[in-house]
Amino acid sequence: MKIPMKLILLKIFQVVLFLCTVPAWGADFIPAITNYTVKDYQGAHQNWACAQGDDGVMYFGNNNGLLVYDGFSWELYKVPGGYIVRSVFVDKDKIYIGSFEEFGYFTRNVTGGMEYHSLSAKVKNQDAPNDEIWHIVR
């Protein structure tokens, strides 16, 4: 029985293609991770929450306030009273934060900075003094 030349060439091609992938088998996948220190972002040591906006900007609830990282630089925005930001939630152009007896949101102003708008006075049933907002849900 004679084997067609096309079939032989196809099998040789398959073996060569298979052997080309062998070096990739032993390669470990290591994601690109960058660790930042307190000196890098000029905040406190503890970060309590994080969220990412549609534009890729990262927001972190920190002991010193709201940290904003755009992939190149860090910005720190304080919350009135200097409280710890415990929760962060991004909804379009508003960055909601929860803190000690404080709830509100940041928005970008015309100069590119962030402005804080408190919603605490508008929250009903404020019968829980000395309470912190740990989670924000839609």
Would you name each region that the model predicts?
Residues 1-138:
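Carboxylate-rich, polar loop motifs that coordinate divalent cations or form catalytic acidic clusters
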